[in-house]
Amino acid sequence: TTERYVAYVDNLARQGYIVLRSDYRGHGFSEGQASGGYGSPAYTIDVLNAVAAIKAYPDADPNRIGMWGHSMGGHITLRSMVVTNDIKAGVIWGGVVASYPDLMYNWRRPDAGPTNTPDPTNPRRRWRDELVETYGSPEDNPQFWASISPNAYVSEISGPVQLHHGTNDTSVPFEFSQLLFNEMHAAGQPVEIFLWEGDDHNITTYFT
């Protein structure tokens, strides 16, 4: 939640870190159209621009930039660490860090509401249908789906990654983090995983 993010940022700042918390385009006070983080590179571009801004900040050490991402932000963090070597370490909480076939077939985050079912009219959910219509399904065109999945490039991740996930997360399966841990470990990449027993998507029991 926004309130918790403020607390996290405050704590990091008190520890001496320079912290920049981004609002993706179309979110918060940012301009532009919200496009979602899975069917478009837009949010990743926004974050990479933020990294470039931090590198230019006089008091920042450009060789010690880390990134923390929660939920969709975990997906963006993973993507960003594949794209650039500027991010030296990543921490991901409750991250949407599975391959695209898993996101297509093994993840349906319910919308809030009385029916608790996905809303097909939600523009942030249309990415599945639009990509399949344009490029075919993962079975029909596995090369395309691998090409847009950061999981296919774990050997190129720019630094160590620490994964955190509550085992009672009803928004993003904790198995996604387990799979990424296994992929990175198999690739010889430095990675840690912490599974918080019985905790939720925000890991509110252990981090309050």
Q: What is the predicted role of each segment?
A:
Residues 74-85:
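Short glycine-enriched nucleophile-adjacent loop
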Residues 38-58:
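Alpha/beta-hydrolase active-site loop
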Residues 157, 163-165, 169:
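Short beta-strand/loop motif that positions the catalytic acidic residue
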